[in-house]
Amino acid sequence: MSNEINYDRRHFFASAAMTIVAAQVGMIGSADAESGKANSANLPAIKPGTNTSFAALKQTDAGLLNVSYAEAGPANGPAVILLHGWPYDIYSFVDVAPLLASKGHHVIVPYLRGYGATRFLSSETVRNGQPSALATDIINLMDALKIDKAIVAGFDWGGRTADIMAVLWPERCKGLVSVSGYLIGSQESGKMPLPPKAELQWWYQFYFATERGQAGYDKYRRDFSKLIWQLASPKWNFTDATFDRSAAAFDNPDHVAIVIHNYRWRMGLAEGEAKYDELEKRLAAAPAITVPTITLEGDANGAPHPDPSAYANKFSGKYAHRNINGGVGHNVPQEAPEAFAKAVVDVDAF
């Protein structure tokens, strides 16, 4: 689910003035997005769920990890890195990747730490799920693959990771596509309470704060994840086969530890690592994103998410927002692969 939004929304709800200003910027961005300047009209049409597999996955050592990733398109094409969320995996992009490859992009789709066949190189490494650690993983992967610059695109955890990369390493990011917009938060912003109905939507983070929650997620991780899928995308009639393909990624031996630490860290209930302190300090200031960006939102997103006007002024470079209609929920790339791929191609042309 769009866990990243939790603390960001607390930050945005606390600033009504920001929302008013952002609304004006957001309208400008949306108009530009629909102005016909894009060069992606010839993307091949594809029905969601057309593809069910990637080519053989690859592995590479990168920083603290041995990363498992899918690859598509020409190796010398402009790079695109697609980043999944929780509880999802690389199959969120199984239809997006071939669309981008058909446009000549070199597409990399990694399993994040704690997912799929991605593994820590050392048993001594802290199983740390804090946001800056995940973003650092992707920079390390780019280094390992000798990718100097890429478009980064994602949703949920992946959207937040992409946002963080764009803030901390803008020189490595040619462009950004982020579902639900600006997802950068901090432990401090997480201390701000929300109205009761809003807090209710985050039931799972309070559950994860308990030992019972950790044990429950471990024991019922597939049932738990399927429930999140259903809540976050209430109009998406995914099949058991579709879910099972992704759910296999949650069998990673570090999965539960990473997920639980991620949420406990956000609530200030778990410590991070000192080596990320300076990065988190920079992120806590909620800096603007300067790289060219397109943000997306599904019209049936069942996960809590901010209104686009609440974050539009956090993008100071070329920017557009697009609402994706047709019953599209939280997992935009899997539910609306053409729209997601179009955003990537279009931001490349900004």
Predicted features, each with a name:
Residues K58-A62:
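Short acidic-hydrophobic surface loop/beta-edge motif
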Residues V328-A336:
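Catalytic histidine-centered segment of alpha/beta-hydrolase-like enzymes
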Residues A38-A56, N66-V67, A72, A79, ...:
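Flexible "cap/lid" subdomain of the alpha/beta-hydrolase fold that forms the substrate-access gate
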